[in-house]
Amino acid sequence: MAVPKKRTSKSKTKIRKTTWKKEACESAIKAFSLAKSILSQRSKSFYYSKKNIILPSSFESQSKEEE
C-alpha cells in the first residue's frame, strides 16, 4: 500500500529558497557588472569585437566626433 511522504518543513523550504535567490542575485550582479564594463570599454579580462558591440547613443556621438 502506498504511504504518503512526510511534508517538508517551512524552515527547510525557506532555507532552500533563500540559497537559490542568493545564487541568482550573485549571478545577476556579475552579469550586470560585466555588461557595464563592456559598455564603458574598460574590460581587460577578455577580447571583443568593436564592430559587433552595441553602444549607447552617448558613445556613438563621441565616436563620430573623433572621426
UniProtKB/Swiss-Prot annotation:
It is found in: Plastid, Chloroplast. Coiled coil: none annotated. One of its GO terms (biological process) is translation. Its main location: plastid. One of its GO terms (molecular function) is structural constituent of ribosome. It comes from the Eukaryota. GO terms for cellular component: chloroplast; large ribosomal subunit. InterPro entries: Ribosomal_bL32, Ribosomal_bL32_plant/cyanobact, Ribosomal_zn-bd. The keyword Ribonucleoprotein applies. Keywords: Chloroplast, Plastid, Ribonucleoprotein, Ribosomal protein. Belongs to the bacterial ribosomal protein bL32 family. This is Large ribosomal subunit protein bL32c. The gene is rpl32.
